Amino acid sequence: MAKPTTIKIRLNSTADTGHFYVTKKNARTMTEKMVVRKYDPVARKHVEYKEGKIK
């Protein structure tokens, strides 16, 4: 079986609220860590989310 090109990642909030999103990314084309600005419902504002591992 071949290795999949897309992997699941966890986007952790930098506001230290414990909120996270789970998304996919192409591991071959996006080799660096993903940083996205998204809405944090706990902090009730837009913050940066950084990539982490799914446990």
From Swiss-Prot:
Q: Which keywords, in A-to-Z order, does the entry hold?
A: Ribonucleoprotein, Ribosomal protein
UniProt-listed Gene3D superfamilies:
Ribosomal protein L33 (2.20.28.120)
Q: Name one GO molecular function term.
A: structural constituent of ribosome
- Record's InterPro entries? Ribosomal_bL33, Ribosomal_bL33_CS, Ribosomal_bL33_sf, Ribosomal_zn-bd
Q: Name one GO biological process term.
A: translation
Cited Pfam families = Ribosomal_L33
Sorted alphabetically, the Gene Ontology cellular component annotations on this record are: cytosolic large ribosomal subunit
Instruction: Fetch the HAMAP family from UniProt.
Output: Ribosomal_bL33
Q: Which family does it belong to?
A: Belongs to the bacterial ribosomal protein bL33 family.
Q: Which PANTHER family match?
A: 54S RIBOSOMAL PROTEIN L39, MITOCHONDRIAL, LARGE RIBOSOMAL SUBUNIT PROTEIN BL33M
Q: This protein is called what?
A: Large ribosomal subunit protein bL33
Its lineage opens with: Bacteria, Pseudomonadati, Pseudomonadota, Alphaproteobacteria, Rhodobacterales
